[in-house]
Amino acid sequence: MKIFIFLLLFIPNLGLSASMNHIGEKGEPSEVDRVIKIEMFDNYFEPNEINIKKDETIKFLVHNYGSLVHEFNIGTKKMHLKHQPEMMEMIENEILLGDKIDYEKMKEIAKTDHSMAHSHSNSVLLEPNKSGEIIWKFNTEI
């Protein structure tokens, strides 16, 4: 199975479901095998290729050097495509405003639509010059 790790402006991302088991699960800080720094820019991210071994737990340290909100997440192509409408809804509801996130609107909408909270363990949504991290245990080699 091919696995994708995407940097995104606003689309696509992933829809969380049981299918997350296809690529792994949230990792434990005490089990991190390796740390990978991810630098996000407006049209690309570095490094542009990552090799991961089966059962490896990776801590991704992610920083947004771009001028827009960007998202880094781990998922299959199908998962990313499934999440596109949610990301568009965030734009339409003025939660994502180009270079910032309206966290108050995000919290309000998340009361009725939990996917809008963007608190998934395989994803970080970052404003410009902000950082985040993901710890992920992969169950397949990529």
Regions found by a protein language model. Name each.
Residues F10, P29-E31, Y65:
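Generic structural signal for beta-strand residues in well-ordered domains
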